[in-house]
UniProtKB/Swiss-Prot annotation:
Annotated gene: secA
SUPFAM superfamilies the record matches: Helical scaffold and wing domains of SecA, P-loop containing nucleoside triphosphate hydrolases, Pre-protein crosslinking domain of SecA
Family, as annotated: Belongs to the SecA family.
Compartments where found: Cell inner membrane; Cytoplasm
Catalytic activity: ATP + H2O + cellular proteinSide 1 = ADP + phosphate + cellular proteinSide 2
GO cellular component: cell envelope Sec protein transport complex; cytosol; plasma membrane
Keywords for this protein: ATP-binding, Cell inner membrane, Cell membrane, Cytoplasm, Membrane, Nucleotide-binding, Protein transport, Translocase, Translocation, Transport
Protein name, per record: Protein translocase subunit SecA
Enzyme Commission number(s) of this protein: 7.4.2.8
Length: 968
C-alpha cells in the first residue's frame, strides 16, 4: 500500500524538490528582469531589500529577488580576475538551476546532499546573501582554515560586489581583529574558531569590550557530516596547565611496560606452540578428516583463541586466520565461550592471562594473575587496586572518643588526601595500560620533535596543539619516552553538538549525508535533501574485490596500479592510516612506480600534492583522502585516458566515508572509476562481519591470489558497516545525553557571567549576592525549624570571622522564620557593605575629581571580584563533573541507571557551585582593602588599585590598574 501511495504522490524528497522548483523559476525570471539594470542600480538593490525586511517583509518573500540578484552578479563577473590564495583566477561560475534549488533548501534549514564538483561553495552564496540582509550574524563553517580563506576570497567577491562585508577567521588572529571580523555581514571560519571564540567570550573575557562575537543567527556548515557527526564526540576545550605535575606516569611507566612485556611473551609462547601443530596444514586447501588430527587442530585453535584475547594482533594468529577453515575454528571457540553455560570455563581460561584485551569494544581488564604479577614480581603496590571506603573511614574517626573535634577534622583531611592520591595512581596506571594496549603509533598518533601529535581519524591530518584528555596523552608520552608534560586543567568546554544548537537557523551541505539522515533529524532536527546532479555521473563503480589474506590483497592492488598506470590514468589510493600508506609506498618503490604520499607526516605539502594528483600518470597515496575537502581537477590528457581511478585499500567503518572516497572522481561529468580491495584480515571484517561470512569463505575459497567478487559479499560488508554506524551513533547520542546536563549548567553560568560583564551598576549585583548568602545562612540557622536546636553558634562564629557583623541571638530567636532571619542578616551585611564602599567612593572621588569616574573604578573592582570567583569556582566544578562522569558508570553494577544518577548528583553539585560562588564573592567583598594612588606623571595620571586580603581561606593578592584622566 505504501509503495502504491509513494508511486502515486511521489516520495517526500520528490514533493519537496517539486515545490522548490517553482521558486527556481521565479529566481530565473528575476535574473532576466535585472539584466537591464546598470551595475550601480543592481548594487542599490541590497539596501532596498534590507529596508523591505526591516519594514516587515519576510525573507521567504525576498528570496526570488535576492537569489536572482546573486545569479545576475555572477554572470556580470564572468571573465573578471579574482585573487584566491595568492593565485589569479578568472571568474567563470553562474549558478545552475540545481544550485539554486540547493540554495533554497539551505535557506529553509535543510542539509543538501550535492555530489563532489557540483558547486556547493557557490550554492551557499545565495542563502548567505539573503540571510545577511537581516543584519544579524551569518556564518559559513568550513573544515579547515585553507577552505575558509579560499571561499571568502573566491565566492565572497560576489557578496562584496553587492555591498556586503565579509571576514575570515583563521587561527592566530588577535582578539581586536576578531571583533572587527565578527562585525562583517558574512564570516567564514572553522567550527573550532567559532566555538573557541564562544568559549573565550564566556569564560576568559573580563570586560564586555573583550568579547568578540555578536550572537548566533544563521550558519551553513560545509561538509556538515564531518563536522556534526565525525567530530561530534570531540569537545572543544580551553585549558591551561594544571597546578602540579602528576608524577605517577614517570613512576609507573617502566613497570607497566614490563607487565605488557610479560603478556606479550606469554602470548608469543602459546602461539608458537600452537603453530607447531598447525604448520603442516596451513598450505592445505582442505583439512584432513582424521578425528585425532582434528582434535589436535581444535586444541591449537583454542589456544589461539586465548592469544586473541591477550594480543589480538599476534603474527601467528594473523597467519593462521588466513586459512578459512582454521579461522572458522578459532571463531567457533569464540562463540563457544560466549555461551552462558560455558562462562565459568571461559573465565578460568582467561584467568591465565595477565590482561584481557577486548578489541571489539576498545577496552581491557587486568586479571587476578596480572594484579599478582604487578605486586609480587614488578614491585607495584596492592593499594593500586583497592579504593578506600570513605564512609567507613569517616565513621571510624567519628567513633574514636580519644580524638578532639580538631583532631577528627585533621584525620578526615588526611584520609581524603590519601584517597585522592590512590585514585590518581590507579587512574594513571589504567591510562598507561590503555596507551600500551589500545593506542597505536602512526595510527592514533605520530611522534614529532619530542612531542605526541594526534592524528585526526577522519581527515588524517595531524592535530598540533590538541591533547588526549584525562591523562591519556601523558601516558602515551611515557610509553614513547618523550618529555612528559603537565596535565591540563579545563577552563571551559562545549561539544560541537551543543554549540551549533545556539544558532537560530542551521543548514548544511555535503556530498554524503543521506546515510546519516536519522541522526541529523533526531539530534539536530535537520532534514536531508538530495539535490539532482547537473550532469549525469559517469563514474564506474566496480564490485569490491575480496581476498583471503592481506598479502594477497596488496599484491592485487599493486598489479592493478601497474595496469592502470600504463594507460596514463591518474590514480588515487586511499588508505586508513599512516602505517598503511607507508607500507604501500614501500611496495610501490620496490616496483619502481613513481608516486606521491600524502599523510599526517607531510601534510604541509597537501595543496601541492593535490594540485598534481589529477595529471596524467600521477599516482597519489593518501591517508583518509575522503576528509581532505579538496577537489582533484583533471588535465585534458587525464580525461582522455579515462579520468581519475580511485582505489580503496579497505572499507571504512562508515559507508559515508567510502562514498566520499568514490566521489573524488568523475566530478561534473568527467570520466572516472572506483574500486575497493578488501581482505578478510581487515579490521572491519575481523571485528564486525557477520558469522555467515566464515561459512561462505569456507565453501567458496578461491585459489591463491584470486579475488572473490559477488553482490552477496557487498551486502555483508554493508551489514557490518551498519552495525558499526549504529554502535557509533549510540555512543554519540549517549555522549550528548550527558553533555545536555552540563549544557544547562553552562548556559546558566554564562548568562550570569554576561549579566555581570554588561551591568552598569555592579553595586546592585553585589547586593543581590549578599541577599542570596543571607537566605542560605537563614536556612542553615533554622534548618531544624527549632531555635533551641539551630546551628546559630557555628554560623555566628563563621560570620564574625568572615564579615564585620555580629548577630543578636535574641533577635534571631524572636524572628523565628527563614525569610525574617534572612532579611535581618541581609540588612546587617548590606549596611556594612554600603558603609565600606561609600567610604571608598568618597575617597576615590576626591583623588580622581569626578564622581562618575570614581563610580566607574568601583564598578570595575566589583566586576573583577565577581568574575574571578565565577571563573575559579566553575573550573573546580568542571573537574568535579569530569570525576563524576568517570565514576558514575560503575553504578550500573548496582542496577542503577548511570544517566539518572549523573543527573541527580550533578544537580546537587551545581547547587553547591552556585552557593560557593556567592559565598566566595561576598567574603571577598568584605575582605577587600583598597587604596588609590596617583602616578607621578603630571599629564596623564594612572590610578592604581591594589587589593590586599585578610589571611584566611585561599584569597590571593591581586592588582588592578585603571586608566584615568588627571584633574585639570
Amino acid at each position: 500500500m505504501m509503495d502504491f501511495l509513494k508511486r502515486f504522490f511521489g516520495s517526500s524528497q520528490e514533493r519537496i524538490l517539486k515545490r522548490f522548483q517553482k521558486l527556481v523559476e521565479e529566481v530565473n525570471a528575476c535574473d532576466e528582469k535585472f539584466s537591464s539594470l546598470s551595475d550601480d542600480e543592481l548594487r542599490e538593490k541590497t539596501p532596498q531589500l534590507k529596508r523591505r525586511y526591516q519594514e516587515g517583509e519576510s525573507l521567504d518573500k525576498l528570496l526570488p529577488e535576492a537569489y536572482g540578484i546573486v545569479k545576475n552578479v555572477c554572470r556580470r563577473l564572468a571573465g573578471t580576475p579574482v585573487e584566491v590564495s595568492g593565485y589569479h583566477q578568472q571568474w567563470d561560475m553562474v549558478p545552475y538551476d540545481v544550485q539554486i534549488l540547493g540554495g533554497i533548501a539551505m535557506h529553509k534549514g535543510f542539509i543538501t546532499e550535492m555530489q563532489t564538483g557540483e558547486g556547493k561553495t557557490l550554492t551557499a552564496v545565495m542563502p548567505l546573501y539573503l540571510n545577511a540582509l537581516t543584519g544579524k550574524p551569518v556564518h559559513l563553517v568550513t573544515v579547515n582554515d585553507y577552505l575558509a580563506q579560499r571561499d571568502c576570497e573566491w565566492v565572497g567577491s560576489v557578496l562584496r560586489w553587492l555591498g556586503l562585508t565579509t571576514g575570515v577567521l583563521v587561527s592566530g588572529i588577535p582578539p581586536e581583529r576578531r571583533k572587527a571580523i565578527y562585525q562583517c555581514d558574512v564570516v567564514y571560519g572553522t567550527a573550532s574558531e567559532f566555538g573557541f571564540d564562544y568559549l573565550r567570550d564566556n569564560s576568559i573575557a573580563t570586560r564586555k569590550e573583550e568579547q568578540v562575537g555578536r550572537g548566533f543567527y544563521f550558519a551553513i556548515i560545509d561538509e556538515v557530516d564531518s563536522v556534526l557527526i565525525d567530530e561530534a564526540r570531540t569537545p572543544l576545550i580551553i585549558s591551561g596547565p594544571g597546578e602540579k605535575h602528576n608524577p605517577v606516569y614517570f613512576e609507573l611507566k617502566d613497570k607497566v611496560a614490563e607487565l605488557v612485556h610479560f603478556q606479550r611473551e606469554m602470548c608469543n609462547h602459546i602461539a608458537a606452540e600452537a603453530r607447531k601443530t598447525l604448520d603442516p596444514f596451513l598450505g592445505m586447501d582442505v583439512l584432513p578428516k582424521d578425528r585425532k588430527i582434528m582434535e589436535g587442530i581444535s586444541e591449537a585453535c583454542r589456544a589461539l583463541w586465548l592469544v586473541s584475547k591477550g594480543m589480538p594482533l599476534n603474527r601467528v594468529l594473523r597467519r593462521v586466520r588466513e586459512h578459512p577453515d582454521l579461522r572458522a575454528m578459532v571463531d567457533k571457540w569464540d562463540v563457544f565461550y560466549h555461551a552462558e553455560q560455558n562462562k565459568e570455563e571461559c573465565l578460568e581460561r582467561l584467568s591465565s592471562l595477565y590482561i584481557v584485551v577486548d578489541e571489539h569494544n576498545n577496552d581491557f581488564e587486568l586479571t587476578d594473575k596480572g594484579m599478582q604479577q604487578w605486586i609480587e614480581k614488578i614491585g607495584g603496590a596492592a593499594e593500586d587496586f583497592v579504593m578506600m571506603d570513605m564512609g567507613h573511614e569517616y565513621a571510624l574517626i567519628e567513633e574514636d572518643t580519644t580524638l578532639s573535634p580538631e583532631d577528627k577534622l585533621n584525620r578526615k583531611i588526611a584520609v581524603s588526601e590519601k584517597d585522592t592520591q590512590r585514585k590518581a595512581r590507579a587512574h594513571g596506571l589504567r591510562q598507561l595500560l590503555r596507551a600500551h594496549l589500545l593506542m597505536e603509533r602512526d595510527i592514533d598518533y605520530i611522534v614529532r620533535d619530542d612531542q605526541i601529535v594526534i592524528i585526526d581519524e577522519h581527515t588524517g591530518r595531524p592535530q598540533a596543539g590538541r591533547r588526549f584528555s584525562e591523562g591519556l596523552h601523558q601516558a602515551i608520552e611515557a610509553k614513547e619516552h618523550v618529555t612528559i608534560r603537565k596535565e591540563s586543567q579545563t577552563f571551559a568546554t562545549v561539544t560541537l553538538q551543543n554549540f551549533f544548537r545556539l544558532y537560530e537557523k542551521l543548514a548544511g551541505m555535503t556530498g554524503t549525508a543521506i546515510t546519516e539522515s536519522r541522526e541529523f533529524k533526531e539530534i539536530y532536527n535537520l532534514y536531508v535533501l538530495q539535490v539532482p546532479t547537473f550532469k549525469p555521473c559517469l563514474r564506474i563503480d566496480h564490485n569490491d574485490a575480496f581476498y583471503m589474506t592481506e598479502r594477497e590483497k596488496y599484491q592485487a592492488i599493486v598489479a592493478e596500479i601497474i595496469s592502470a598506470h600504463r594507460s596514463g590514468k591518474p590514480i588515487l589510493i586511499g588508505t586508513e592510516s599512516v602505517e598503511v600508506s607507508e607500507k604501500l609506498s614501500r611496495i610501490l618503490r620496490q616496483n619502481r612506480i613513481h608516486h606521491t604520499v600524502l599523510n599526517a607526516k607531510n601534510h604541509a605539502q597537501e595543496a601541492e600534492i593535490i594540485a598534481g594528483a589529477g595529471k596524467v600518470g600521477a599516482v597519489t597515496v593518501a591517508t583518509n583522502m575522503a576528509g581532505r575537502g579538496t577537489d582533484i581537477k583533471l588535465d585534458k590528457e587525464a580525461v582522455a585516458a579515462g579520468g581519475l581511478y580511485v582505489i580503496g585499500t579497505s572499507r571504512h567503518q562508515s559507508r559515508r566515508i567510502d562514498r566520499q572516497l568514490r566521489g573524488r572522481c568523475a566530478r561534473l561529468g568527467d570520466p572516472g572509476a572506483a574500486k575497493f580491495f578488501l581482505s578478510f584480515e581487515d579490521r572491519l571484517m575481523r571485528l564486525f562481519a557477520s558469522p555467515k561470512l566464515n561459512t561462505l569463505i569456507r565453501h567458496f575459497r578461491p585459489p591463491e591470489g584470486e579475488a572473490m567478487s559477488d553482490p552477496m559479499f557487498d551486502r555483508l560488508i554493508e551489514t557490518a558497516q551498519k552495525r558499526v554506524e549504529g554502535r557509533n551513533y549510540t555512543i554519540r547520542k549517549h555522549t550528548l545525553e550527558y553533555d545536555d546536563v552540563m549544557n544547562k549548567q553552562r548556559q546558566t553560568i554564562y548568562a550570569f557571567r554576561n549579566d555581570v560583564l554588561h551591568a552598569d551598576d555592579l553595586f546592585i549585583v553585589a547586593r543581590e549576592q549578599i541577599e542570596h548568602v543571607s537566605l542560605a545562612l537563614a536556612f542553615l540557622i533554622l534548618k531544624d525549624a527549632r531555635a533551641d536546636h539551630c546551628s546559630l553558634p557555628k554560623v555566628e562564629e563563621w560570620l564574625s570571622y568572615s564579615f564585620p557583623v555580629k548577630l543578636d541571638d535574641q533577635e534571631i530567636r524572636r524572628l523565628g522564620n527563614v525569610d525574617a532571619v534572612a532579611d535581618y542578616i541581609g540588612g546587617l551585611l548590606i549596611e556594612a557593605f554600603d558603609a565600606k564602599f561609600s567610604s571608598m567612593l568618597t575617597e576615590f572621588t576626591e583623588i580622581i575629581g569626578s564622581a562618575s569616574g570614581a563610580q566607574g573604578v568601583c564598578n570595575d573592582i566589583l566586576r573583577s571580584v565577581i568574575i574571578s570567583h565565577i571563573d575559579e569556582e566553575w573550573k573546580v566544578h568542571l573537574m568535579d563533573m569530569d570525576l563524576l562522569r568517570s565514576e558514575v558508570g560503575l553504578r550500573s553494577v548496582g542496577q542503577k541507571d548511570p544517566l539518572i544518577e549523573f543527573k541527580n548528583e550533578s544537580f546537587l553539585l551545581f547547587e553547591g557551585l552556585i552557593r560557593d560562588i556567592r559565598i566566595a564573592i561576598v567574603k571577598h567583598l568584605f575582605a577587600l582593602e583598597l587604596s588609590l594612588t596617583r602616578s607621578d606623571r603630571p599629564d596623564n595620571a594612572i590610578p592604581t588599585v591594589a587589593t590586599a586580603f585578610h589571611n584566611h581561606d585561599n584569597f590571593r593578592p591581586m592588582e588592578l590598574t585603571i586608566i584615568g584622566e588627571e584633574e585639570n
